[in-house]
Amino acid sequence: MARGQNHAATELVHVGFGNFLAMNKVLAIVTPGSAPIQRMIREGKKKGIIIDITSGRRTKAAVFTETGNIMLVAITPEAVAGRVNTRSARLARTAGDKTS
């Protein structure tokens, strides 16, 4: 493995329609309503860095990744955060059960 890489398991979060996000590669999850974010999405489409995983639904969040891509998802940033927190709490509880 390359120097400086994280050996921990990648946390995948379901974002609908059979799609998942690798949370260790996510920089920010934002709502697409503001003018600056809409501008970034428009420019991203021109550059070819947009990954649309909405399956034709309305975009409710834009996910910025370490690789410079912008992923468009059909669930809200709050829903993504809730899924991360729910899964993390479940994993912590399971790990606590194993140490007892």
Can you say where each PLM-predicted feature lies in the sequence?
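C-terminal structural segments of small proteins and small subunits
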Residues: A62-T99
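Phosphoinositide-dependent membrane-docking surfaces
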Residues: M23-T31
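Short, structured protein-protein interaction patches enriched in aromatics and acidic/basic residues
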Residues: D52-E66
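Plant-biased recognition of short, low-complexity, intrinsically disordered N-terminal tails
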Residues: M1-A9
